[in-house]
């Protein structure tokens, strides 16, 4: 059957594209794998079975403490990372799993906890870093090597679990903060946004320092998102949790 042959052909081409995506470059992302039925005018999208049907960043509201971030991993490739958090009665301990011996990643998560201890009262008077213990599990969803851009996602995850508030749905957290709260803009913004789109993100939390780079992003890609700018670490937390 002609349709079956077409689907197999598109599957094979899609696999080639997935390999080329690992080399980077917008030209490998901007490819439509669909066909239109001339009788019904219905468009059918073709994916590859091994990728599954679900998006890495799911629809709907996540659990408090669950955060998705998109950035460059240790291998140099851009991918999606998931943080899942727990809060227990305790005395202010912060444990992390999933980071192994990655020193840069651990330092970034330490930065977040230190920032929360110093500035938590500016976010909420109910945040406690002395009477609770926190555990965050970090997951490299695409096996590209853990990112070191984890301070801001960790801060948001800690505040989310501490306040019992989930992040807004289909949100990808972009950008990073230093120990002083200085915002660090997103490198290679167009490619990062393309990965966000491929992964199911519909809302993008973006530092205002990256606003000037939006000119490098194709209009079609920009139109796929609700861009939410933040101008400080605290502002990023409020907007990630949907608090005005």
Label the model's feature ranges.
Residues 5-9, 42:
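The conserved phosphate-sensing helix
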Residues 8-24, 116:
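Short, non-transmembrane amphipathic alpha-helical segments
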Residues 1-3:
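Amphipathic, interface-forming alpha-helical segments with heptad-repeat character
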Residues 36-244:
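Peripheral, non-AAA+ core regions of ATP-driven protein-machinery
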Residues 17-35, 133-136:
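A short amphipathic beta-strand at an alpha->beta junction
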């Amino acid at each position: 059957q002609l349709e079956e042959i077409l689907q197999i052909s598109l599957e094979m081409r899609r696999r080639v594209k997935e390999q080329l995506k690992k080399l980077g470059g917008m030209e490998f992302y901007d490819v439509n794998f669909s066909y239109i039925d001339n009788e019904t005018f219905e468009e059918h999208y073709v994916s590859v079975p091994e990728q599954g049907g679900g998006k890495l960043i799911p629809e709907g509201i996540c659990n408090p403490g669950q955060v998705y971030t998109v950035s460059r991993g240790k291998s140099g490739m851009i991918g999606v990372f998931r943080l899942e958090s727990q809060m227990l009665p305790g005395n202010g301990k912060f444990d992390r799993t999933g980071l192994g011996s990655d020193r840069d990643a651990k330092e970034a998560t330490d930065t977040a906890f230190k920032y929360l201890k110093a500035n938590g009262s500016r976010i909420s008077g109910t945040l406690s870093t002395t009477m609770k213990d926190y555990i965050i599990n970090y997951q490299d969803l695409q096996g590209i090597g853990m990112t070191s851009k984890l301070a801001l996602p960790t801060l948001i995850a800690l505040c989310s679990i501490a306040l019992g508030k989930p992040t807004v749905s289909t949100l990808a957290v972009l950008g990073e903060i230093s120990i002083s709260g200085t915002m660090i803009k997103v490198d290679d913004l167009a490619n990062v946004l393309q990965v966000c789109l491929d992964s199911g993100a519909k809302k993008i939390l973006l530092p205002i320092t990256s606003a000037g780079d939006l000119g490098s992003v194709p209009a079609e890609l920009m139109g796929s998102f609700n861009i939410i700018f933040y101008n400080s670490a605290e502002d990023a937390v409020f907007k990630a949790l949907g608090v005005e």
